[in-house]
């Protein structure tokens, strides 16, 4: 398992459930196509799982 993961916003949050919008914002994703590098821990994995249709995840 990688130490860090790259998460990229690939789908717009227009029309998304407000809870999902807040989760995406908490991950640091503000604009379409933005990529952030996050630690690969349980909290990050859970947040990414909740917004899986909106993001792409790659191990670093």
From Swiss-Prot:
One example of a Gene Ontology biological process annotation: translation
Keywords per UniProt: Ribonucleoprotein, Ribosomal protein
Q: Which domain of life is it from?
A: Bacteria
Q: Does the keyword Ribonucleoprotein apply?
A: yes
Cellular component annotations (GO), alphabetically ordered: large ribosomal subunit
GO MF annotations in UniProt = structural constituent of ribosome
Q: Which CDD domains match?
A: Ribosomal_L30 (cd01658)
Xref: SUPFAM superfamilies: Ribosomal protein L30p/L7e
Q: What subunit structure does UniProt give?
A: Part of the 50S ribosomal subunit.
Q: Identify the NCBIfam families for this entry.
A: rpmD_bact
Family per record: Belongs to the universal ribosomal protein uL30 family.
The name on file for this protein is Large ribosomal subunit protein uL30
Organism, per UniProt?
Agathobacter rectalis (strain ATCC 33656 / DSM 3377 / JCM 17463 / KCTC 5835 / VPI 0990)
Q: Which gene encodes it?
A: rpmD
């Amino acid at each position: 398992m990688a130490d860090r993961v790259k998460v990229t916003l690939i789908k717009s949050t227009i029309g998304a459930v407000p809870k999902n919008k807040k989760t995406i914002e908490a991950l640091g994703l503000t604009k379409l196509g933005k990529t952030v590098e996050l630690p690969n821990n349980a909290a990050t994995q859970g947040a990414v799982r909740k917004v899986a249709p909106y993001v792409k995840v790659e191990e670093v």
